[in-house]
Amino acid sequence: LDAAVTAAAGIGYPVMVKAAAGGGGMGMGVAVDEAALRTEYDKVRAFAERMFGDGSVLIERYFPRVRHVEVQILGLADGRVVALGERECSVQRRNQKLVEESPSPAVSPELRSRLLAAAVRAGEAVSYRNAGTVECLLDPETNEFFFLEMNTRLQVEHPVTEYVYGVDLVEEQLRVASGLAPTFDPDALAPSGHAIELRINAEDPKRFLPGPGVIRTWVEPTGEGVRVDSGYTEGNTVTPFYDSLLAKLIISGATRDEVLERAKAAVAAFQIEGPKNNVPFFAELLTNEEFLSGAYDTGIVSRMR
């Protein structure tokens, strides 16, 4: 605790108190002063020991208004590391992602160049070989970005990158593991179009509390640029024991505006009866002016609620 107090004093308040072994937004708290730090430290440490078997805690700078942007990298069999653009992941509840899109509406060509170069350097520094995600926080006022963590695996949201870059990341992982060259030209990677993923969860659309139950109706949307990844169908039981993700609704198109229009139609056509689900939330989000403008941050869901 004394080390945490010293670290926080050096960083400056407010700070984020984070479980070192945590993930998925679990094991995090914000401290605005030393008294709050002492409380949050004990709370996060106890949670981390109970959930992860490791009570180690990190103290980080906290940004009240920030965007969550991540870079998809791929460490190739020949030793090179390439970046396949960025994903915007700022629509979150309880620090867990609900929406991901690529390219990010917040990232200019100049910022993209810096962001991708930094992610590639991170991969090169550890001789990385595989698909991986370098996650960052982006200050929209200054365009400064700060390293969060690297996920050494595919992310739930990898399909949006696949659509925009025309690369099958699962296949490329297997090729790296087999010592084979990629199917694409690493020197000619360039984004084309836009893609958005909506995480359809079994949860109340207002407070996002778990909503298990038996699926009575399950009708997936179809249409140009519409894809649904799911393992559920009518008659299945959604239990409270696992992650609430029911499906990934992935929309692609030539422009962000086109994708948003397709997403509205797809959400309206997605019928799920039985367990509570967040489809109504997405219908609301897709009419929200802040989201439609692209000028949103990680606080957008709390402002909607």
At which residue positions do the language-model features occur?
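A conserved helix-loop-beta module that forms one wall/lid of the active-site cleft
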Residues: 1-27
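ATP-dependent carboxylate activation and anion-phosphoryl transfer catalytic cores
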Residues: 19, 24, 31-305
